[in-house]
C-alpha cells in the first residue's frame, strides 16, 4: 500500500478532485490529516511513502522511515534544499516541485507590465481622490510597440508570458541557464537566445525585463546596480520570481533616481514585517510605496488558489509513482537547487 500523506487538511472540493484523479490506481491511499499541526501529522508520517505539502518540519521528516517522494505543489523550493540534502545523505528521497500555477503567474506578470506601462495605479488613485482627467503631463502611458522584452528564465512561466505577449509589436529575447538542443515546443514568435554567461549583453539588448527564475545561490543578487544601469533609463522591470534575485537597495535607488523607468513587483524581501506605529506592514526595507513609478503586488501571482486544474501535475506524479515509473515531473536537482 502506498500511503500519500497531505500535510494539511484540504477542503472538500480538492479532496474529491484528488480522489477522482487517482481512482483505480493500484494500492494507493490518500491520507488527509485532521489538522496541519505537527501533533496531528507525526502519527501518520511513519507509514507515508509520499508526502504532499510545502513546509515539512525536521521532526516530521525524521519520522518518515518509508518516505520515497515529496511533492511540493508550488514552484519555490529554496526552503527545502538544505533539509532534503541532509535527508538524502541517509537515504534517497525524491523532491519534486509543481508548476500548476504557471498560467496564473504569467497572467499576473503581464497584468503588472500593462498596469506599469499604462500608469493604471496612478490614474486610479487620482480618480479615487476626485482628481478628474489630469492628462498626460505627469503620467503618460508607455507604448509597448517597438520594445524589446527580455525574459530572464524561460521555464513554465516565461514561456507562457511569451505566448501572452506574442500579439504585441515587440521583440523577444530570453536568457536561460541551459537551452535544450531540441524536443521542446517552438516559441510562439522569433526569440533571440542568450546563454547563462551572457547576462550583461542580454540586459544591454532588452529594455523590458520580466524575471521568472528560481532563487538559488547563483541567482541571489543576480540583478544589482550595474545590471539595472544596463537596462537603461527607459527600462522596465517585472519581478514574479523571488525578491532576493534583485538587490533591494539597488532597485530602490534605480527607481528613485531614474536609472530605470519603472518596476512592477510581486515578490519581496521581508515576509514577516512588523507593523509601524500606524499598524501598517511593508514587506521591504526601503519605501517603495513612496515612489510613483512602481506597481506593488502582495505575492499573489499564483491566484486563484481555488482552481483545481492546478493540481493535475500532482495527480500525474502520483500515477507515475504508483506504476513504478521513473519519469516523474519536475524533479528537483538538489545540487542546482531547482
Summary of predicted features, one role per range:
Residues 124-160:
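Glycine-rich NAD(P)-binding loop of Rossmann-like domains
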Residues 41-44, 60-63, 201-205, 227, ...:
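Structural alpha-helical scaffold elements that stabilize or flank donor/cofactor-binding regions
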Residues 1, 145-148, 234:
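Phosphate-coordination loops involved in phosphoryl transfer and adenosine-cofactor binding
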Residues 178-284:
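Rossmann-like adenosine-cofactor binding region
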Residues 47-128:
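Phosphate/diphosphate ligand-binding glycine-rich loop within oxidoreductases
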Residues 234, 242-338:
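Rossmann-like dinucleotide-binding domain for NAD(H)/NADP(H)
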Residues 1-48, 173:
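N-terminal glycine-/charge-rich "phosphate-binding" loop or analogous flexible N-terminal tail
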Residues 60-66, 83-90, 228-233, 254-259, ...:
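Short, conserved loop/helix-junction motifs that constitute active-site signature segments
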Amino acid at each position: 500500500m502506498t500511503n500519500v500523506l497531505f500535510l494539511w487538511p484540504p477542503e472538500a472540493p480538492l479532496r474529491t478532485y484528488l480522489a477522482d484523479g487517482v481512482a483505480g490506481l493500484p494500492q494507493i491511499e490518500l491520507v488527509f490529516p485532521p489538522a496541519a499541526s505537527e501533533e496531528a501529522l507525526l502519527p501518520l508520517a511513519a507509514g507515508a511513502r509520499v508526502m504532499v505539502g510545502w513546509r515539512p518540519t525536521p521532526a516530521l521528516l525524521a519520522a518518515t522511515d518509508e518516505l520515497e517522494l515529496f511533492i511540493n505543489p508550488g514552484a519555490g523550493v529554496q526552503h527545502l534544499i538544505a533539509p532534503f540534502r541532509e535527508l538524502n545523505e541517509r537515504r534517497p528521497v525524491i523532491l519534486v516541485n509543481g508548476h500548476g500555477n504557471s498560467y496564473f503567474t504569467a497572467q499576473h506578470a503581464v497584468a503588472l507590465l500593462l498596469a506599469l506601462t499604462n500608469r493604471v495605479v496612478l490614474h486610479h488613485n487620482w480618480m479615487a481622490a476626485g482628481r478628474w482627467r489630469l492628462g498626460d503631463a505627469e503620467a503618460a502611458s508607455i507604448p509597448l510597440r517597438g520594445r524589446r522584452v527580455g525574459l530572464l528564465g524561460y521555464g513554465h512561466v516565461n514561456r507562457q508570458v511569451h505566448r501572452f505577449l506574442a500579439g504585441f509589436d515587440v521583440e523577444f529575447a530570453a536568457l536561460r541557464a541551459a537551452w535544450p538542443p531540441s524536443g521542446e515546443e517552438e516559441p510562439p514568435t522569433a526569440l533571440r537566445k542568450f546563454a547563462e554567461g551572457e547576462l550583461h549583453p542580454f540586459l544591454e539588448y532588452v529594455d523590458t525585463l520580466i524575471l521568472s527564475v528560481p532563487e538559488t545561490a547563483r541567482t541571489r543578487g543576480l540583478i544589482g546596480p550595474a545590471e539595472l544601469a544596463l537596462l537603461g533609463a527607459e527600462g522596465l522591470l517585472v519581478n514574479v520570481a523571488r525578491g532576493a534575485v534583485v538587490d533591494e537597495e539597488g532597485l530602490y535607488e534605480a527607481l528613485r533616481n531614474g536609472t530605470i523607468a519603472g518596476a512592477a513587483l510581486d515578490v519581496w524581501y521581508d515576509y514577516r514585517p512588523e507593523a509601524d506605529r500606524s499598524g501598517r506592514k511593508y514587506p521591504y526595507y526601503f519605501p517603495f510605496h513612496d515612489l510613483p513609478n512602481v506597481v506593488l503586488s502582495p505575492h499573489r501571482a499564483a491566484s486563484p488558489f481555488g482552481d483545481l486544474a492546478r493540481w493535475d501535475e500532482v495527480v500525474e506524479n502520483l500515477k507515475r509513482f504508483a506504476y513504478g515509473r521513473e519519469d516523474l515531473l519536475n524533479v528537483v536537482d538538489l545540487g542546482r537547487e531547482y
